[in-house]
Amino acid sequence: MRIGIVTETYSPEINGVALTVAGLVHGLAQAGHAVQLIRPRQKSDGPAAAIEERIATTLVRGMRLPRYPGLQLGLPAGRRLRALWKSERPDALYVATEGPLGMSALRAARDVGIPASTGFHTRFDDFARHYGLGALTSLVFAYLRRFHGLGAATFVPTVELAEFLGGRGFHNVVRLPRAVDTNLFCPSKRDEALRAQWGVGADQLAVIYVGRIAPEKNLPLAVRTFRAIQRLIPQARYIWVGDGPARAALEAQNPDFIFAGVKSGEELARHYASSDLFVFPSLTETFGNVTLEALASGVPTVAFDYGAAREYLTSACGRRVARGDDDGFAAAACLLASDAVAFAAARTAARRCVAHLEPATVVANFVRALAELSGAGNAQSAPTDSVDPAAAPRREADESAAVSTAPARAECRGSLPVHP
C-alpha cells in the first residue's frame, strides 16, 4: 500500500508525537509499504529531499515556536502537495498534526480525491488552561472539530480519549493503540556502572522522571513526592532525564537531584532500566508514551488515572491515582517504594502489562484501518485484532487479585533488585 504521512514534528526532535510518528513510518516501511513522508525541514536536513528504503521524504518550510525552540509549525503547502499528489498519488493519507501544514494537506487531499485520516495527539485545551488561556478552549475545539472533520476518521490511542472527543462533536473516532519497542526498552539494559555514576548502590532506590522539564508537567508534585519517599528511604536518589525551561530553577532549588539531560535510543533505555521507580505526575498528557517505556523496562510506575496509565497501568505493575489527588499520589508512591513485597511483585509484572503492544501489530492494525477507509482491499497486513473504538483495552483480569510472579518475556529479562 502507498501511504502518505504528514507531520509537523519528527525524529530527531524529541517529543511523544515525533517519536510515535517516526516509529509508525519505519514500521510501515519494514512491513513492505511505500511511505511518502511530508514534514518541515530540520536543521540536520540537507538541501534535497531524503530518500530511504521505501520512504520518500518531501521537506517543506516551517516556523519555530516561541518558548519551544525545539519545535516548529509547518507552513501551508497546499499548492505543492496538490502537484505532488497528482504525479505521485498515495492510496491513503494520514495527517498526524493539526497545524497549518496539516490543514493544507487535508484540503489538498480533498481536492485531488485522496482518502485522508487524522491523528489526535495533543490536548491543546489542557495546555490553554494551564497557561491561563482557558477562555480560548471553545475556539480551540471549534478549530479541531473543523480540522478533523476534513478526514474520514480520527485515530486516538485510548478509549477514554475516543469518548471525550465523541462527547464534543467529533465523528468517527477510532481507537488505535500505541506501540512500545520492547526490544529497546528492556530490563536487561540495567547498567550498574550508570547507577554508580548516579551515586546509587545496588541496594539503593533510584527514582526517575523522564520528560520535558516544564511547568505543565506538574513538577512541584514530583518534587514533593520524592521528598516524601526520601523521608522513608533516606538514601533514595532522584534522576531527571530531559530538559526544558523549568530545569535551571529546579536544579538550583534541589542540588541533590541528578540531571542527565536529554536521552534517546539506547541511552534512554539504559536510564529507564537502571532506575527502580518511575514517578510521573503530569496531568497534561494526551497519552504518555513514557509510561509504556518505563513498564517495558521493568520499572514500576506511579501515575494519574488517565491516558496510558488508565489503559495499561494496573495494580500489578504500579499505582494509578485519581486525577488531582496530590496527597494520594505521594502516598501511593511512598507505600509502593517502602513495601518490599509489593515492590518486587510490581517489578516482575511491569513488563507484562505492555508486552502485547508490539510495533508490528500496531502497524498492521493501522494499515487495515486505512485500507478500509480507502477501499484498498488488497492492502497487505497480517491478521490482527480489529481496530475498535469501543473496545475495552487489554488489562489484567482482576486488578485486586494476587500478583502472579511468572517470569516476563524471556527474550528480554534482567536481574531486578528489591527495595527497600
Predicted regions and their residues:
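N-terminal subdomain of nucleotide-sugar transferases
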Residues: 1-59, 393, 399, 409-412, ...
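Nucleotide-activated donor-binding/catalytic signature segment of Leloir-type glycosyltransferases, i.e.
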Residues: 247-267
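Conserved donor-binding/catalytic core segment of Leloir-type glycosyltransferases
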Residues: 200-227, 347
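Aromatic "clamp/platform" in nucleotide-sugar-dependent glycosyltransferases that forms part
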Residues: 283
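Conserved acidic donor-binding segment of nucleotide-sugar-dependent glycosyltransferases
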Residues: 164, 315, 319-326, 335-340
